Amino acid sequence: MRKKLDIKKLVLLNLPYVFAFYFVDKLAEVFRLAPGTEFIDKLTGGFANIGAAFANPLPSFHPVDLLIGVAGGALLKLAVYMKGKNRKKFRQGEEYGSARWGRPEDIRPYMDDDFSNNVILTQTEGLTMNSRPKQPKYARNKNILVIGGSGSGKTRFFVKPNLMQMHSSYVVTDPKGTVLVECGKMLEKNGYIIKSLNTINFRKSMHYNPFAYIRSEKDILKLVNTIIVNTKGDGDKSGEDFWVKAEKLYYTALIGYIWYEAPEHEKNFTTLLELINASEAREDDETFKNPVDLMFDELEEREPDHFAVKQYRKYKLAAGKTAKSILISCGARLAPFDIAELRELMSYDEMELDCIGDRKTALFVIISDTDDTFNFVVAIMYSQLFNLLCDKADDVYNGRLPVHVRCLLDEFANIGQIPKFDKLIATIRSREISASIILQSQSQLKTIYKDAADTIVGNCDCTLFLGGKEKSTLKELSEILGKETIDLYNTSETRSTNNSYGLNYQKTGKQLMSEDEIAVMDGGKCILQLRGVRPFLSDKYDITKHPKYKMLSDYDKRNAFDIEKYRSHKLVVKPTQTFDLYDMGEVEAD
């Protein structure tokens, strides 16, 4: 499509050259009509009669005058072109870099006037929870990368202040279980439903059964993949070798059978373990059939195209010796389930993961910071959580959950690997879900997620550094902060019979904060980097200044939360509660 010609712009741009043509044309006329033959005489006479020449407003149409006028306009055009071509680009005070620290006016458009509707980042900076601000250019996702070495205050200066905001549902990784004790009562008093998954003390945990959240065959595949990724031993090559693929087939077949065929109370890991224990392969007898083989034979007779049957057929292609090795590997992988307490913990479900975005809920995931034996349980839970919430947002709520779900993932490197987390973190924003990834150093993320680590970091619009000394983290942060231009002067002294002194001023570039300066940063300070905004060097948030601080057990020990008392209290029937009554008819004794 041809672009429309802007006549007004064309006239304005060429008007100076028209004036130049007119002026030079008139001067040529004056010079031509001046008396005399010598150049000096004509020049003198021309200046004397210049007023009379311009008395006639029309240009001279004499060919010589017109030619000289055109030449004058062309020379002006050429001069303007050459000046523009050779123009110097000066950025006063920014010759070597324009980095600077952010100011209050820089963060103001990103914060909500209502303090309680902000994500707390520092003492002076925050981020509005409104995902659709009036001006879309100020919209930022709520994914946050928090980096802080041991003792830098990740829990005190970030996790607790944000729990006190109470504007969302929360899923909190809680090493040692202290956050639940300190913040649980505050949340309960403000109408939150409290859930707890405790992998340190199973008796203090609510029950979690991954089988309760299987909705389709693809969920079976996701569950199997999460188990494989988070329980692989040192002997596995890459997680995709022959043996692991064979294990996946076997797990998929068994879980598929349990999900389709078992009664509700048997849909759990205990049944899966019993099926594996009932399996047997004999190297010297390929025709031998164990109880599980017979069970699948019976299912195949009824439903030859059953999902579980198809997977089991592929597994049974393995020879006796190979099948025996697969069974040994499966048994070793699920060895933690030999612990009766773990089997009981995962026998049925109380978590209601798919309801966390429906109402204000706080789920505390308590893990050990010294032992990762049961971290695969946490990884399975998080994997199912993200997928369930995304599916519910899409299928029930037209793409956005009614209550925002914030995942405060403390000790993120210790909760196992969430499959395809790099893809999840890029898509959860639109569903009103966000993740705060809390690490001791950025290298921890690369250790777990390898090449996907950069994608995960790139999908966090906000980075908060609370302190640390890990070299790669310091280097990357210093580079991101950029360079500023500073003034530099040198002095020189020459000693001789005639002493002389010199003073030389110049400009140079310097990192806004070098690696060594970041390493020795004041313990009360932090660095905040928000996408599209200058970085901030600010005070860490003072938790005692929060309006809800007095509701924490930090302020008053009587505010300590007891999960066992809370669970027993939930079992007491209140007089005000209502129930649905179903008439089941008469029940005959056997």
Predicted regions and their residues:
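A short glycine-/small-residue-rich loop at the edge of a beta-strand within enzyme catalytic domains
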Residues: R108-P109, F376, F412, G468
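General secondary-structure edge motif
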Residues: A99, G126, K142-N143, K310, ...
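Short alpha-helical interface patches
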Residues: A53-N56, D65-N118, E217-I227, L275-A278, ...
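Basic- and hydrophobic-enriched, low-structure N-terminal and domain-boundary segments
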Residues: M1-S152, R156-V159, R203, E588-D590
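Low-complexity, polar-biased intrinsically disordered regions enriched in Pro/Ser/Thr/Gly
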Residues: L127-P133, K232-F242, L488-Q506
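P-loop NTPase motor domains
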Residues: L10, F21, D25, E29, ...
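Conserved long hydrophobic alpha-helices within structured protein cores
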Residues: F115-L121, F376-Q384, L477
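Conserved ATP-driven motor cores of ASCE-family P-loop NTPases powering translocation/secretion/packaging/pilus
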Residues: I425-I527
